[in-house]
């Protein structure tokens, strides 16, 4: 019997999959909303929820741990100063997925991933 895999491989090799997820998570944290296929967004959701949970405690160690995955200093700072304080009281479920239907070309299920609560904009 085939054992269940812990994550979706997305039909890519490990280095390609890691680069794809890294880029999608960074753009999700930058724009606070992202649109893609449902399968990709499930994986992005897993990674981003872990990153937000880790960023709730602002220590040098946590910043270094997250900087291994997020190389953009602006996004890393935004995660620690604007996004994670909004979710301080929430113990999980920081994102929501809204299904859009099927894509015209190949009938892939599309969705939007967004943060549940919006961070306050600096005026």
UniProtKB/Swiss-Prot annotation:
NCBIfam families: L17
Organism: Borreliella afzelii (strain PKo)
Gene name for this UniProt entry: rplQ
SUPFAM superfamilies, sorted: Prokaryotic ribosomal protein L17
GO terms under biological process: translation
GO MF annotation terms: structural constituent of ribosome
Known partners and oligomeric status: Part of the 50S ribosomal subunit. Contacts protein L32.
Pfam families found in the cross-reference section: Ribosomal_L17
Protein family per UniProt: Belongs to the bacterial ribosomal protein bL17 family.
Protein name (database record): Large ribosomal subunit protein bL17
